[in-house]
Amino acid sequence: MRSSYLEVNSGQGNYRKHVEHITASVTLTNNDSGKVYMCSSADAAVSITLPTTSTGLDGVHYKFIVWEETPSNDITIALGSAIGSIVSKDATGDEGASTQGTQISNIILDTTAQRGDFVEIMFWGGEYVWTAFSSINAGIHTS
């Protein structure tokens, strides 16, 4: 007899990613780690606040994917302080938003971003490390 863990539809295993659609500002917690967020800003600018350096846990990670083709408003992923280091490539192969040693506080999915552009973020050692890819020049930038 097969274990229910081997049955894809049993609900016992984690065969699928946990995906949520963000359309309004939200504050994420460590418990949201591992989720994939499809991001749209048709109604207003969206701010996504992550755990701070004092509340973040090592290994907490999130993925944000632009769902709306050329978002209506900016989507800002906020850290609360300059604790983010990012490696980024855009459509022209430029380093784009890469921090190159200068940490940042926010990453912005710009109104020029394309559906499928994404950012992966992980907390480690009191700071965030990020990887971002955009199919258009300057679709993702920092502040």
PLM regions and their residue ranges:
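Exposed extracellular interaction/assembly regions and N-terminal maturation sites
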Residues: M1-G96, F123-S143
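Extracellular disulfide-bonded cysteine-rich modules/repeats
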Residues: Q114-F123
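A conserved acidic, glycine/proline-rich C-terminal tail/linker
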Residues: Q100-D110
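A short catalytic or substrate-binding loop motif that flags glycine-/basic-rich loops and adjacent residues
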Residues: G56, T111-A113
